[in-house]
Swiss-Prot record:
The lineage of its organism: Eukaryota, Metazoa, Chordata, Craniata, Vertebrata. InterPro entries: Ig-like_dom, Ig-like_dom_sf, Ig-like_fold, Ig_sub, Ig_V-set, IgV_Light_Chain. It comes from Homo sapiens. The gene is IGLV5-52. Residues 1-19 form the signal peptide. Residues 20-44 are annotated as: Framework-1. This is Immunoglobulin lambda variable 5-52.
């Protein structure tokens, strides 16, 4: 009986800690040089964007992904090394989405952009 209870406690803890949202991004986005663009990373229902750190990556053909930035709140955000300040993050709570804004678009910004999350209670 004690082993069964311990196993159930461990399983429920592990199941909860592994639960992650499904992330949805638009398939494509186009804009002109000099314009600003807003890319979204929507979390699935049952999850709140405010509980997660959103990370953004840029990938150009033939290259590995480049880490751009993370965003959790205005007081908890960070820019990757060498990433210009025209790349910025935010959250849109009404859309339950993380946002990557690129201002002053340049030709070299043409790339694939990916988001990822980690939970605010995570220690890793």
């Amino acid at each position: 009986m004690a082993w069964t209870l311990l196993l159930l406690v461990l399983l429920s803890h592990c199941t909860g800690s592994l639960s992650q949202p499904v992330l949805t991004q638009p398939s494509s986005h186009s804009a002109s040089s000099g314009a600003s663009v807003r890319l979204t990373c929507m979390l699935s229902s049952g999850f709140s964007v405010g509980d997660f750190w959103i990370r953004w990556y840029q990938q150009k053909p033939g290259n590995p992904p480049r880490y751009l930035l993370y965003y959790h709140s205005d007081s908890n955000k960070g820019q990757g090394s060498g990433v210009p300040s025209r790349f910025s993050g935010s959250n849109d709570a009404s859309a339950n989405a993380g946002i990557l804004r690129i201002s002053g678009l340049q030709p070299e910004d043409e790339a694939d952009y990916y988001c990822g999350t980690w939970h605010s209670n995570s220690k890793t």
